[in-house]
């Protein structure tokens, strides 16, 4: 029995990161031992290589503006560990986490002794989320974001009302597969019998895989790019604006506060999701709530301005496609500015290609490391770069010194490469 939050959290972090046996067997056993909390909630399930967090934020915000109470389970965290489980965007308390772990611990330890093996850290956190929304704090809807992939992700015991797949890109290829088709197959593993699926995936080969899986499960399928048009796109000083035509209606001058050309697509996909919820009488989201929700939606670490002198932006782009979209946005928004990039990445990411894309927008790059088991060495990143104006340090505190050196220079500082890295730097900046 834990009385201290830090002890409860340490117990979670002390668990295995990956299961000895892949699959959903342990999660299904945990759910059964807990009285099947996954069957007691009204949920939506969101998967995809990039755009998951922003799409969750958009859908949550629209539902909130329509008067609903919305829970979310997301990962990784950017500001606090507790934000993984939130209600209306507010993280649960230390006391609630401790109570959840105390209820979970005996079931986990009993499962340790079975043929299913030890539940992992992420499985336990996911089970805590199901338990929280089923018993501790009942809400109108819960949005679950997958952690990795889809088919065998621990969130995939959910019985959703709607499934969303944001995008398919090259990430976690050592686990999900080497081709776009293989990765799409893993993401499409969240499609359930008869449950509607909406997607913003663009690649024809990936769409074919998702469409086939939807047909196999008799799941109504809608593709953003098949049936909808985004037009009149414009970058605003503090967000994006676009118009959007679906099979149902035309939305003129939609605005978001999240910055980036890719956020228009995430917002459009969220509108498509809202249309489904309205059409199926699952929720009622008025046009006013939809528009207001998209403007009010916020998500930390997505081209987030965290300091003004000098301007410092944090962005969690952590794979090739994410960095490509980031570079595209920076070119569009800051064409006449000098940009200094601070970069770090995990060892298993294609950081050489990520660096190449950032070199197209950077005046200078400072390479850093951070305290994480899979973090790259700053020197390795430095050696992979061909830009002439570059520096490196293994000490994350030197990032703060690098930023301070830019005061009065009219340069923009962009910190990117890993969600874990920007979370670490965010704390140091505060």
Swiss-Prot record:
**Reaction(s) catalyzed by this protein?**
7,8-dihydropteroate + L-glutamate + ATP = 7,8-dihydrofolate + ADP + phosphate + H(+); (6S)-5,6,7,8-tetrahydrofolyl-(gamma-L-Glu)(n) + L-glutamate + ATP = (6S)-5,6,7,8-tetrahydrofolyl-(gamma-L-Glu)(n+1) + ADP + phosphate + H(+)
Q: Which UniProt keywords apply?
A: ATP-binding, Folate biosynthesis, Ligase, Magnesium, Metal-binding, Nucleotide-binding, One-carbon metabolism
Q: Binding positions for Mg(2+) 2?
A: 172
CC cofactor: Mg(2+)
Query: How is its cofactor bound, per UniProt?
Result: Binds 2 Mg(2+) ions per subunit.
**Stated family:** Belongs to the folylpolyglutamate synthase family.
- What protein name does the entry list? Dihydrofolate synthase/folylpolyglutamate synthase
Organism name: Bacillus subtilis (strain 168)
